[in-house]
Design a protein with these regions (language model features):
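Surface-exposed, flexible coil segments in extracellular/virion-facing regions
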Residues: 121-125
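Bacterial N-terminal signal peptides
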Residues: 8-17
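Functional-site microenvironments in short loops/helix caps that host divalent-cation chemistry
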Residues: 132-261, 270-272
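A short glycine-rich, aromatic-capped structural motif
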Residues: 69-120, 134-136, 212-213
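Sec/Tat signal peptide C-region and signal peptidase I cleavage site
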Residues: 18-24
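Bacterial N-terminal signal peptides that target proteins for export
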Residues: 1-9
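Short, structured beta-strand segments at or near domain termini in extracellular proteins/domains
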Residues: 271-280
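Alpha-helical segments with a strong preference for the paired helices of cellulosomal dockerin domains
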Residues: 25-26, 32-59, 112, 136-143
Length: 280
């Protein structure tokens, strides 16, 4: 009986005696689920964390700004600037200034509100990501959106996309955007056969949804081999014949949905598994 009591008491003692640093940089003293009390649920979450090294909830509160275009609202998440390695060989180091990125992919609803058309191959739920849009189409959409809002929206650069996907300064270095388990954060070929409504899987460390799976996402950059060295706010090659897209889709195997995967095609190309998200 004494051993059992000690086992139950020890996690509570550790929680109260030692602050726990979460990936959000906050120090919590026991109330891990932020419900105002320290309970057995908090003890369980601590034990799960110690065993898995993956926090059971996301205490980080993203700084979100909401914009509206013709009655349709969408959110942009602030990404604090930082420095990271773009490749896996420590040859390409990137420093980024602070920027914002779409909390979700651009939806059919937002596209229709701005353009008055719906090019998507998949219909149904209007909160599905728009697809069947080329890079050129995205530029036309952004021009009209900026006229409506008075803002300066754009596509993210590949570096901005990658930094946001990996969790920015709060990164846990997951293979996928927000988890080592793709099924938690992504719609891909094993759990979907078409696009799905945005933000129905778990977000990543920054509170951003669907950066892996659902639809591939256009980036601003021309495609080219990564350079070597350290760069600040890189824009990619000055010229090219194809544009970068990232993230994988509902049509992709897990291996194509990793944060590091990159692909490219001509800016006029349209398919039903590629869309985009905004940057600002």
């Amino acid at each position: 009986m004494k051993k059992c009591t000690l086992f139950l008491f020890l996690p509570v003692f550790l929680m109260l005696a030692f602050p726990i640093k979460t990936f959000a940089g906050d120090y919590l003293r026991g109330d891990n689920n932020e419900d105002g009390t320290v309970s057995i649920a908090d003890v369980t979450s601590l034990i799960d964390y110690l065993l898995s090294n993956e926090w059971p909830n996301n205490p980080f509160k993203p700084e979100v700004t909401t914009f509206t275009a013709n009655g349709v609202s969408f959110n942009m998440v602030k990404i604090e600037g930082g420095t990271f390695w773009m490749d896996h060989s420590d040859n390409y180091k990137v420093s980024l200034s602070t920027y914002s990125i779409g909390q979700t992919e651009v939806t059919r609803m937002l596209w229709y509100a701005v353009m008055g058309t719906d090019p998507s191959g998949f219909k149904g739920d209007l909160t599905r990501p728009v697809e069947m849009v080329s890079w050129d189409d995205c530029q036309q959409f952004i021009t009209k959106l900026n006229s409506l809002t008075g803002q300066h929206f754009r596509l993210p650069t590949e570096a901005e996309w990658a930094f946001a996907a990996c969790g920015g300064n709060l990164s846990h270095n997951y293979v996928y955007a927000g988890s080592e388990d793709i099924s938690i954060v992504a719609w891909y070929e094993e759990n979907a056969n078409e696009t799905q409504p945005v933000a129905t899987k778990a977000p990543n460390e920054l509170g951003i949804y669907d950066m892996c799976g659902n639809v591939w996402e256009w980036c601003q950059d021309w495609y080219g081999e990564y350079p070597s060295g350290t760069y600040t706010n890189p824009q990619g090659p000055e010229t090219g014949t194809s544009r970068v897209f990232k993230g994988g889709s509902w049509h992709s195997p897990a291996s194509n949905c990793t944060i590091g995967t990159r692909s490219h095609t001509g800016p006029e190309n349209q398919v039903n598994h590629r869309g985009f998200r905004l940057a600002l």
